[in-house]
UniProtKB/Swiss-Prot annotation:
Gene3D superfamilies reported for this sequence: Mur ligase, C-terminal domain (3.90.190.20), Mur-like, catalytic domain (3.40.1190.10), NAD(P)-binding Rossmann-like Domain (3.40.50.720)
Superkingdom per UniProt: Bacteria
The protein, known as: UDP-N-acetylmuramoylalanine--D-glutamate ligase
UniProt KW ATP-binding keyword: yes
Region (Disordered): 284-310
Keyword Cell division: yes
Reactions catalysed, as given in the entry: UDP-N-acetyl-alpha-D-muramoyl-L-alanine + D-glutamate + ATP = UDP-N-acetyl-alpha-D-muramoyl-L-alanyl-D-glutamate + ADP + phosphate + H(+)
Assigned EC number: 6.3.2.9
Disulfide bonds: none
Matching HAMAP family: MurD
Length: 504
């Protein structure tokens, strides 16, 4: 379970850094397999400390700043995804570990090594991986549903929770190993993966987020790119130029499928067709080709004569229960991933029609007197809010603001100009958003609370508009988390409805 280095003695001395959900999962996994443990956290009393005893995990816990002393006697380092490799006390520790030849793994590497070991006994599941700045959870949940509708036993795990190692442990204990793993992966998790190679993977988009953790956008994008192994079918968003740079790689044998909001022009690619006022999910097909799935027919290194391309209509976009063009492309990505592992199309299309979406992700709360109230509290970065505005494609009163995490808000200007009636600002970094939007000519007002902003938005919204909570910011300056922020928004909308004699 711990790789070739420990082949003859699969019980290395492990240092677990960080005791969040993934750190606890790695500690449980290592303890389960007989490893000796040292567990360290910068917090003297992390919340999961009591869970170590509750789970019967024996190990030496060390609280406080990290130091190289922690490496004494250690043969393997397990690092939690919440720890930035640029942290001042972590940089020398990791550098010393590598100088000493001590492997540094994250949870995803433990998972990859475990699958490799289980494979020696004949276990060969399909593995699908999903990453991107925005849309990961929706696409992951939808992909899992599609695989289930195709008759597969599916495990959905990773950044979406539960931790992949916990899900694997449960499957082993219940002798119910799945046919398909669908994993939502963050850039943090991918940063410390070395041998992970899924059968199919997607990068939905790359926009600025977590730049303080990675040190810059290029490093962030490079971490996202680690989702692809040499033989992974690459599903890429062709509307995102930074994503498409990953189509060109030294791994020239990699199979490639793209999706986007426009009509596809290459055999096997996916997109949207606008015809007589309707939008269709479509796939480009070579009229002269066989019925094999496109990824098995074409590799991106092959050169052939231009095919005669037709567009196969899969379903109308308005048959989806999830709102917005961005969710239509999420649906295309999920469909492409499921097809890439050889699943039949018909049950997948039924699954697309079923999926109702995830909470706080462009979720329609209510329609009151012709105005839609939409909760996108999970929109914690600029890219998410841009996607929500462009995806709804209607006149919007936007509520934004909070902890900006060091982002530049300039990319909001174009969609705000195109779609917004006015913008209501809340939170610590409202002045930065105002500065980025002042030249748009759109009315901008500041509000002390989300309740106040929501009522003000309701007062100016016209029938046919949407009042959209899509903050483009984290929530911790004012709330316990994005779910708490969403609850305050919903409660205020309920009060507005009640005041107009409507129940929701």
């Amino acid at each position: 379970m711990f790789g070739e280095k420990f082949r003859d003695r699969q019980k290395p001395m492990v240092l677990v850094l960080g005791l969040g959900e993934s750190g606890l999962a790695m500690a449980r996994w290592c303890a389960r397999h007989g490893c000796r443990l040292r567990i360290a956290d910068t917090r003297e009393v992390p919340p999961n400390l009591s869970a170590l005893e509750a789970h019967g995990i024996e190990g030496n816990f060390v609280g406080g700043p990290f130091s190289e002393v922690l490496l004494e006697g250690v043969e393997l380092v397990a690092i939690s995804p919440g720890l930035s490799p640029l942290a001042a006390d972590l940089v020398p520790l990791i550098a010393t570990a590598r100088e000493r030849g001590i492997p540094v793994w994250g949870e995803l590497e433990f998972f990859a090594q475990a699958l490799k070991t289980l494979g020696e006994s004949g276990y060969a599941p399909k593995v699908i991986a999903i990453t991107g700045t925005n849309g990961k959870t929706t696409t992951t949940s939808l992909t899992g549903l599609l695989c289930e509708r195709a008759g597969k036993k599916v495990a959905v795990a990773g950044n979406i929770s539960p931790a992949a190692l916990d899900k694997l442990t449960e499957a082993i204990d219940n002798t119910a190993l799945p046919d398909v793993w669908v994993l939502e992966l963050s850039s943090f998790q991918l940063e410390t993966a070395h041998t992970f190679e899924p059968d199919a993977a997607v990068i939905l988009n790359i926009t600025q987020d977590h730049l303080d953790w990675h040190g810059g956008l290029d490093a962030y994008a490079a971490a996202k790119g680690k989702i692809f192994g040499k033989n992974t079918v690459r599903v890429l968003n062709r509307d995102d130029a930074r994503v498409m740079t990953l189509a060109s790689s030294e791994q020239s044998g990699a199979q490639l499928v793209t999706f986007g909001v426009n009509e596809p022009v290459r055999d096997g690619d996916y997109g949207l067709l606008r015809d007589n006022g309707m939008i269709w999910l479509v796939q480009a097909q070579d009229r002269d080709a066989t019925d094999e799935p496109a990824p098995t027919r074409r590799r991106k290194s092959e050169s052939t004569a231009p095919p005669d391309i037709g567009l196969k209509r899969l379903m109308p976009a308005d048959a989806l229960r999830i709102r917005g063009l961005h969710n239509a492309t999420n649906a295309l990505a999920a469909f492409a991933l499921a097809r890439a592992i050889g699943l039949p199309g018909a049950p997948l299309l039924h699954g697309l029609r079923e999926y109702r979406g995830e909470p706080h992700r462009v979720e329609l709360i209510a329609s009151i007197e012709g105005v839609d109230y939409v909760d996108d509290s999970k929109g914690t970065n600029v890219g998410a809010t841009v996607a929500a505005l462009d995806g709804l494609a209607q006149r919007v009163v936007l509520i934004a603001g909070g902890d900006g995490k060091g982002q530049a808000f300039d990319p909001l200007a174009e969609p705000v100009t195109r779609w917004c009636r006015c913008v209501m600002l809340i939170g610590r970094d409202a002045p930065q958003i105002r500065a980025a939007l002042e030249h748009t000519g759109i009315a901008i007002t500041d509000h002390a609370t989300l309740e106040e902003a929501t009522r003000a938005a309701s007062a100016v919204a016209q029938p046919g508009d949407a009042v959209l909570l899509s903050p483009a910011c984290a929530s911790f300056d004012m709330f316990k988390g994005y779910a708490h922020r969403a609850a305050v928004f919903r409660s205020t909308v309920e009060d507005i409805a009640a005041g107009r004699g409507t129940m929701i």
